[in-house]
Each structure stands twice: as structure tokens, then as C-alpha cells.
Amino acid sequence: MSINHEIYYILVFEHRSVAIKLIIVVIVLLQFFLARSRQIDRTWAHTNRKERFREMTAIGNTDDALDTSTAASKENGKGRLRVQKACELCKKRKVKCDGNNPCLNCSKHQKECRYDFKATNRKRRRRQVASAVRDVSKTYAETSESFPRDLLSKSNIIINAPSDGVSSSASNSPNPNSHYHHISSTLPFMSGRPNHTFHSGSNLNGENNNNSFPEDHMAKLLLQLSSKLGNTTKESSIRTTRTNASDVNANPTVVNMKNSQEDCDTNHRSAICDSAEALHNNNINSKENKIINSQITNTVNDHFESPWQTFSLDKYRFHRRYQNILPYYLGVSILKDLSPQTIEYAKLKRPRVQNYGWNLSGGHYLKYKGDFRSQEKNIRHESKFFDFDDPVHLSLINKLLRYYFDEINPVFSIIHEATFWQQYNNKFLRQGKQNNSSANLFTSMLYLILSTTLRFREGHLDGQKGQGTYSNTSLNITFEEKSILIKKPSIEENLFKYAYLIINTLTFEWESFELIQSWLLITFYFRTCYRQTACWNALSQAVNMCNGMSLYLNKFPEIHSTYDESKAWHCFWCCFIMDKLISFQMGRFYQLSLPASEMCEQMNLVKSKKFLQEEDDWFHEETFQMLDLSIIVTQFLKRDAQDLNLNETVQLRSQLGQWYDTFIVGSQTNAYDDNYRYFYQVQPFMTYLDIRLTFEVRQLFCLIAPSSTANNKSLEYVVDTELLISHCQMAIENLAEITRSNLFFVPWWLNLSQLFTVNLICIIYLHAGIAVTQNKAIMQSCQEIWRTLECSKPKNRPSMLPECLWCLKMLNHMFCIRLRDSALQLEATLGTDHGDDTPNRNKFEQFKKVGDNDADVEVDAGEREENADERQENPHNNSKRVPLATRSHNTTNFDGSIAISPESAVANLGTDTGLPSDVLDTVSKIGNSPNVFDDDLFSNLLWFDQNFA
């Protein structure tokens, strides 16, 4: 109890001293701001006089002003003339000035009358302000040394002393109160109030706001500051009470982690509530309170800027994916440890920051010549591509469409298959040759589907049948159908260019669900085989159209059909999924926010119908899996270049683990025979692995030198090596299965990027010596896939494949050189001539010294085998050992000359004590037993004499 009272008195004394020092700081600050307010009032008084002088000059001419001033002087008689400001000529001549413009003296001498309003003699007042600032700085320095740092850190309050430079610059700035922005920025709960920043100029109505004084503003700041410190003081006392109540004898500085987390949450909640009460006292309505509370919550959750996320070297492209940034920082870290001669000799180059393995594009690209409109002369009608009256052409189109809806569309469900086939069979064949907007739009969507399917078809290796578990729907194109494609080698690009021209033209002045679907098809095509900027721009078109049509409100015009509601709902969620996942894979922040709560509830209802009643025939099961992943990404993707804190990391792992348990069936990741039969079905699982690896690879930055701009809190991370390695094993087993099925070059874009990420992780772990056995096996599987890809001959060889291999081999080369140099340095300095293991051998056992030649020394294995037969023949003789009396430490000496063995001592024990006869018989039997002392039981009695305290 005395310890608790002492701790309580210490805390009370500390809080009282803190309160006294805080009051001193408040008084000094109030004095300073009162002085500043007087200076501001005088500045505004001079400004008003200047405006009055200009008005007088504009209203009357010089003669009128002269007459007026003369009359005024006559009325005043000999009274002393006092003015606030003299003109330059009067000051130079050192004569009285009447303060008019022009003044009387300048009018008499016909000189130009000029006033200098900037030159104001305020030396005395400036000295007062400077002294006040010095007092504040001195008090701040004394307070900062003695102020409890834990209270300031827990309350997120930073007290900055105003400097002379701030005070002097404030008077010359357009806004004299601009230095108050700095004070408000130091208080986290002030960042959300726009009306905290006041101005001395005019208000919204154009009137001068002379009623806003700095001391009023400072009073509000100090009110909230005191409430914030009060909450921290209460929290500190409560925490101390809980700790002492739980364990009186425990160290008061050691707090249970669970209790500290609960106290931290309580502190956050109480701070938010008290801040809301302080703001309510300032006449802020409930809506503003909600906004400010949310901003306070975001501020309390310490988010620090990431020291790793960065731009590309020569482009305004910000990267948030850690696997794209990690090679750059690794290269910089290793090159610092190598000599310039070694770098030049080995031709080492630092890997650049880029999106490694963006897609599997290659072979042929879109050739952008100025504008697609320039090619309109060569593309006038769709009849140049296919003849829909020809049965061979029609059969080829049907096979391509069937492949798209079976192998590509189920992942994102951009197109409603049932509606498309209905329009294709009923409307398109009848209106295909008509020149109207509806027919052109549907034709464009058809051509986008065909161009995407042709690109996927080229990813299959001709004449090679896969041996893996994944299968893919074969087109089974006949020779006549294949000859049509051979005669038109650039048909894919021409189909896309025609569709892009029509859609871009219609988007110029129209909005519709079909245009949203068209832009999503263009986004998918660009994600497959073109650049990131083109993909982002196409995705932005779809997002802007969703926002422009307000699909997120889940509201409809008065005249609409039931199917319009379905189209609006599905188009929005499809755009939402692609926006979140493609933006995440691109390393950019998403553009489309979550919709109204009604749409989320409806989404859950549709999901239940999808899995239970099969009522939704638009979205597939894979689409709902991608939807759940996109919602997870929305919660944890940071816009302002921030890393996840500890709590967010744990929440992310929990939600991803729930997704894995829900949708991925089976404990073995390579048993896809029952779950994954087609290649498209594994895309949600690969997206899950991509999200996992992207966030978990951040822990590898701990193995390299931290950045100079790194904050201590930004380096805090829950490292889980086993989790990262297990997901690397899942990814590499899945990629190996894809490679065995000869489907690696089918342009699903995560194939190459995931292989690069897993291989990069293994290289870093092997260099650091972490989980060497597991990473060796994963590394071996990666090398087998790389060799297979290098030996393969696809029609469109990925252009980013050499980039990924070069980066991995360059980093591996750097690692090998640094390890070799380190090994040579260690061998040269410390040496490796360690000799045999004699110094490493144990010299003492539990209760004796190793190597004693006594009865307890065990014979080695060879002697046991040689004497085994002898012990069996003479068991009685073999049981005899050297008597314990021969040991000096077991011998009891009397009179310094007679040595009595333990046997005789036990035998004579009963005769001296007068024990009964039956007891004496038992004692004699024990004394005559040859096994009692041979087992060396009494030698262990020395163990009880040891001090284990």
C-alpha cells in the first residue's frame, strides 16, 4: 500500500507542476497576442486614413482643398496643429504639415505632395513585441524540458514557440494574422474547422471584420488545449490505478499490452467526446460536429508518411506497390557498400522504379498515329472486317463470342450475357447495316469483345497440350476460319480502332449504361496488352460517367424500366471492382467511392440469391469474390502516401484470412481438381495473393538500411515471416500448375508480376539467411518456370519478361559480390583456423567434473560391447564397484587417523541409539546391501547445500 501511495503522490505533484507551468505559458501567450492585436489595430487605422486621403483627393480639386484648409486654420486660431502623418517635403524641411493631400505648404510652393505610409517609426513598440517573444521563447524552453513527454505524445499536442521572424514577417504580409495558421496546425483537433482561421480584411458580406480579436481566437485554442490535457491526465491516473490494483508488487512501469490497448482506445474515445463538447460550446451545429469528430479520429490514429513510396525517376508516376519500389532501394543499399572500382568492373546498375510485369503485352501494339480519326477513311464500315452473310465468317464470330463468355467475362461480368445474345440474334443481324447510333454502339461493343478474344487466343501455344490440371475452352477453329484471320493480320488493331472511334464520338455528348460497359471493355483490353496511362484514362471515362449519372445514389428517374435498375446496379459495381483492383495493381489511388448504404444492402441480398437461389444471371461467382476483395482494398489503400499502422495491418490480415477461409476450399493450395477446373476461376485467388504479397512485402524493408526521411513510427510493422513464405509457396505452386498447363502466356496480367514478386522475396530472404530451406525450394521452382518461359515460343512474347529477369539477376549479382567481399574480409581479419573442438567441450556435468577416473565415469561404447559377454557370465562380480570409502570426499575422519566407511557407520548406528530389534534387522540389511552405495545416492546430498537464490 505504501508503494501505491507514493506513486499517487508523485503523479499528483507532477500534474500540479504541469498545470502551473501551463498557466504561465497561457499568461505569456495572452500578453503577446494582446500586443499583436494593438499593433494590428494601429496598422488598420493608418490604412483607413490612407483611404480617406485618397477619397478627399478624388472628390475635390486642389483649390477647394486649399480653401478648406485655410478656413479651418482661421477657425482654430493659434491652436497647435497636430497630425498623425506629415508629407515627405514637410519632414525634409522640418516644418508643420496639416496632413492634407496636398498640404498647405506644398500648395504654396507648388510642389508635389507625397506621403510615405510604409516608413513608420515603431522602434519602441517593436522592442516591446520582441521582448514578449523572447519571454515566450524562454518560457517555452523551460516548459518543454520539464513537461511530461508522454502526455504530449498521447494527446498529439505540439507546442511551438513563436519566433521573431514570424512576428516581424506578419506585419509585412498581406494577412497580418497569417502566423496563427501555424498555431492552429499544431493542434490536431483544430484542423477540421475552417472558421478558426480568421482574417482582418473583409468578411463574406464585404464589411470590415474589426470584431475578430486574436485574444478571442487564442482563448478558444487554450480552452480546447486544457480539455485535451485534462483527458490525458485522467487517462494517466486511471491507468496507474488499474496497474496498481492488478498487481501491487509488479513494476509500475510495466503495463499489460491488452490493458494498454484498452486504455488507449478509452483515451481516444474520451478525447474525441471532450473535443466535441468544446466545439459545441462555440455554437457549432451537430453536422459540423460529426465532420470534426471524424477528422479528430483520423488525426488520433497516427498515420505517418511512408518513407518508401516514391515517384519514378523521370515521370510523374507515384508508386504505392512495395514490390516495384523494393528493387530500387535494395540496389541503392548494396551499392553503398561496394567500392566504385567493383561497381565499374562488374557493370552494376541500380534497378529503376517501375511496375514490373505490368502485363504480358508483346508482339504487336496499337500504333497511335496522331488520332484515330485519321484512319476513318480506311475504316468506313464493319463489312471490311467480317461478312455476316457468310456462314464461315458467322461461325468464326460465334466461336470467338463463345470463348469470351466462357473464359473471360465471368471474372468481371462486364457484359450481361443473356441480353447480349438476345440483341445479337434479334437486333444486330437486322440492323447491322443501318447507320444509326444504337447499331454503331452495339457493333463497337461486339468488336471490342472480338479484339480481346483474339488477343487471348494468341496466348495459347500451338500444337502443345498441357499436362496440368487447368483446362481452357478450345476454339476449334477450322482451316477455312483460320484462313480468314491469316488474310487479315492486323484485324485485331483495326477492330479496336473502329470501336474506339465510335465510342469516343458518342461519349462526346451522350451518357448511357452501354457507354459505361464500352469503356470498361476498353479498360480491360488496355490492361491486357497496352500501357498504364491508356488503361487509366479509359477507366476514368467509365468512373466519370458513373458519377455523372449518379449511379451511386441508387435512385432513378420517374420514367424507367425494371431492367434499367438492374443495369444501373450492375454497371456501378462492375466499375467499382475494376476501379479498385486495377488502380491497386497500377499503384494509384482509386477514383470511385463507396455508394449509398442501400446499394450495399442490396449487394448482400443479391449475393445471397446468387449462391442460394441462382436468381442473378449477370454476375458470376468469381465476380462476387472480386467484389469482396475490392471492398477490402478500399479500406486499406491510402491516398496521401501513408503506410498502414499496426492496428490496420492486423485488421487487413484478419479480413484477408476470412476471405480465404470463405472462398478457397481445401487445405492444399495445389489441389485444384475439384475447385478450379478452368483458368479464369483461379483469377480471384491470384488477386488475393497479389494483395497479400503487396502488403506483406513491406516487412522486407527492415532488412535494408532505412531511409533518411523515415519516421520511427513508420518503421513499426508486425513482421510475420511464416505468413509471407506460406503465401509465396501458394503462389509458386499455382504458377507451376499454370505453366504445366501451357497457359502462362494467356494474357491474364498477374502471371508475370506474381512470379517476379515471389522470386524477389526469395532472393532477399536467402541473402539474409532467413528460412533458407523453404526459400531454396521456392527459388528452385521459380528457376524452372523461368527456364520454361525462355524456351517457349509464343506468338506474342512478353516484352517485360527480359526486364524482370534483368532486375532479378542484377540484384542477385550485387548480393553475391557483397557476400563474397564480406566473407573475404572476415577470413582475413578473424580467420578460420579454429582447430579441434577441445575448447568447446564441456568441463562440468551437473554435480561433478568431466573426466574423473572414478566409479561414476561411464565407459565408452567400445568398452561396453567388449565387456557385454563378461558381464552376462559373471553378473555378481560385475555388479561390484570400487568402494565409496576410497573417495576422499565420502570419508568421515575421527581423531585424524581412523577412517570409517559408510557401511560400518550404518551398521553401528543402531547399537548406539537403542533401536528395536526389527528395526535393527532392517538397518543391517540395508547396510549389507551392495547396491545402496554403489548407486551413489548419498553423493547427491551436496545438491541441497547449494544456494539457488
Swiss-Prot record:
Q: Which UniProt keywords apply?
A: DNA-binding, Metal-binding, Nucleus, Transcription, Transcription regulation, Zinc
Give the organism, scientific name.
Answer: Saccharomyces cerevisiae (strain ATCC 204508 / S288c)
Q: What does this protein do?
A: Binds to SIN3.
- Pfam families referenced in this protein's UniProt entry, alphabetically: Fungal_trans (PF04082), Zn_clus (PF00172)
| Alphabetized GO MF terms | DNA binding; DNA-binding transcription factor activity, RNA polymerase II-specific; sequence-specific DNA binding; zinc ion binding
Q: Where is this chain's protein located in or outside the cell?
A: Nucleus
Q: Which residues bind DNA?
A: 87-113
Kindly give any further remark recorded in the entry: Present with 98 molecules/cell in log phase SD medium.
Q: Which InterPro entries match?
A: Transcr_Regulatory_Elem, Transcription_factor_dom_fun, Zn2-C6_fun-type_DNA-bd_sf, Zn2Cys6_DnaBD
Q: Give the main localization category.
A: nucleus
The identity of this protein, by name, is Probable transcriptional regulatory protein STB4
- For the region Disordered, give the residue spans: 164-214, 862-888
Question: Which residue intervals are annotated with compositional bias (Low complexity) in the record?
Answer: 164-178, 200-212
Q: Name one GO biological process term.
A: DNA-templated transcription
Q: Which CDD domains match?
A: fungal_TF_MHR, GAL4
Basic and acidic residues bias: start-end ranges: 862-874
